[in-house]
């Protein structure tokens, strides 16, 4: 089957979140299932620096973008055999900053043009209008940045099937009315049943409203987004399309995330020999200038510092533990300036008990997963989440809120599951500092029971969330759409 996989970010070329991991791992898993899958993404300047050998395959003038000559570059996704197409429109994509924001942290004002052009290019590839003599059976678009492509393709009678995956409904690609006009979209689409959303243009509605099938990244999240609490104003549309909505759990690339092979670690280890994990803990403590005390529980967190991730809950719940010297905490992430400052203040108050890295570092993320005893993920909502699955494989017991993919992947250490020896972590329900503090107290009590803690670690390490299972589910969906 021929599959065009469209994403605005793909690891290891560029990454701001889990979308990049999925956009690398799922195509590779489909390739291993002998599918003809090709990835298309924008040619940001930093991507061109990392992409290796590239060949110019065609030059296009896309309708609606008279000022931009688009060059399509062909290569291979690094570390794989997956063909890669890069959309090179220098005025729009070769910029400093990340894919969506300027160096000052503000969104690029012309993101609607940038990702409108990206969608138009996806349409041309899908209809084999780029002169490449290749037409996909399925076009798989991801998040709002590719959201207009299913809409554009829906206007053609003879076209590939379309799949749209929601990785995080909170990010919708909303723009002023003038953006709709600038993209020369059909006037009849300026309607609540089209692309209009409370007076703004919504890119994500292009995918949700017009794709042949919608997926999201865990079964629980697929149910949650049908509710007013988690639907972000789109629950009505999603309920209308619930018959073509499926939750497919993301997978983990265990070639990248395996403590037995991880090149970023000072020592490697397995469920049968955990001695290397103690060395990783000592190395993490040393890196953050914390006392290298093997007996103190070390809590870890990696993620964007935004309200969704519940970092504020973590900082409030952890402070009494830090003040009492009952735990250490290491946090890696960046985002909201207020949350960053709160984290800095806490680290300054407890320099012997808290380490902080503002920013993101892939090696450090691996080292934290290996060195921490407990990974804390108190998300207010979490479409899937990857770090809790990484933590399980690394024997780092996750403490998670009972939501979305966290609920689907972590088995709570309640008395019944402890007795059955299938518990893998701690869940809590309410998004409050007290509920998290209670969950951490449960975790610490188990930590101080070494035999029980080792069973928890080993049960987590035995879990299998590999991409093969997820890729087969997507392939079954693709086949249903084209049959």
From Swiss-Prot:
It catalyses: [(1->4)-alpha-D-glucosyl](n) + ADP-alpha-D-glucose = [(1->4)-alpha-D-glucosyl](n+1) + ADP + H(+). It comes from the Bacteria. Pathway: Glycan biosynthesis; glycogen biosynthesis. ADP-alpha-D-glucose binds at residue 15. Coiled coil: none annotated. Synthesizes alpha-1,4-glucan chains using ADP-glucose. This is Glycogen synthase.
């Amino acid at each position: 089957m021929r599959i065009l996989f469209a994403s605005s970010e793909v690891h290891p070329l560029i990454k701001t979140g889990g979308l990049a991991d999925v956009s690398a791992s799922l195509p590779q898993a489909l390739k291993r299932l002998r599918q003809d899958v090709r990835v298309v993404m924008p040619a940001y300047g930093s991507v061109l620096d990392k992409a290796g050998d590239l060949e110019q395959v065609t030059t296009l003038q896309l309708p609606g973008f008279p000022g931009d000559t688009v060059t399509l570059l062909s290569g291979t996704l690094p570390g794989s055999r997956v063909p890669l197409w890069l959309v090179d429109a220098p005025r729009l994509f070769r910029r400093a900053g990340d894919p969506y924001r300027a160096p000052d942290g503000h969104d690029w004002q012309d993101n609607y043009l940038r990702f409108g052009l990206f969608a138009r290019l996806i349409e041309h590839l899908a209809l084999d209008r780029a002169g490449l003599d290749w037409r996909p059976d399925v076009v798989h678009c991801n998040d709002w940045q590719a959201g207009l492509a299913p809409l554009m393709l829906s206007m053609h009678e003879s076209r590939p099937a379309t799949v749209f995956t929601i990785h995080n409904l909170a990010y919708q690609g909303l723009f002023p009315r003038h953006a709709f006009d600038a993209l020369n979209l059909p006037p009849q689409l300026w309607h609540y049943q089209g692309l209009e959303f409370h007076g703004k243009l919504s890119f994500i509605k292009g995918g949700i409203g017009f794709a042949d099938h919608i997926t999201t990244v865990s079964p629980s999240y697929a149910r949650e987004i049908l509710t007013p609490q988690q639907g972000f104003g789109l629950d009505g549309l999603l309920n209308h399309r619930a018959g073509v909505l499926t939750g497919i759990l993301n997978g983990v690339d265990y070639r990248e995330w395996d403590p037995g092979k991880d090149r970023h670690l000072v020592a490697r280890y397995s469920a049968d020999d955990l001695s290397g994990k103690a060395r990783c803990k000592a190395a993490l403590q040393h890196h953050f200038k914390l006392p290298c005390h093997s007996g103190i529980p070390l809590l870890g967190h990696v993620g964007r510092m935004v309200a969704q991730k519940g970092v504020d809950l973590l900082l409030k719940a952890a402070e009494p533990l830090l003040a009492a010297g009952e735990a250490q905490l290491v946090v890696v992430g960046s985002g909201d300036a207020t949350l960053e400052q709160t984290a800095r203040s806490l680290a300054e108050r407890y320099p012997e008990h808290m380490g902080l890295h503002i920013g993101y570092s892939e090696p450090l993320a691996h080292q934290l997963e290996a060195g921490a005893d407990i990974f804390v993920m108190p998300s207010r909502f979490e479409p899937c989440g990857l770090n809790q699955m990484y933590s399980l494989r690394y024997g780092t017991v996750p403490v998670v809120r009972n939501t979305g993919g966290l609920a689907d992947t972590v088995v709570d250490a309640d008395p019944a599951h402890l007795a059955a020896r299938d518990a893998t972590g701690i869940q809590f329900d309410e998004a409050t500092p007290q509920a998290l503090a209670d969950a951490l107290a449960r975790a610490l009590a188990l930590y101080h029971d070494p035999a029980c803690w080792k069973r928890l670690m080993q049960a987590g390490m035995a879990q299998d969330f590999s991409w093969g299972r997820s890729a087969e589910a997507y392939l079954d969906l693709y086949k249903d759409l084209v049959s």
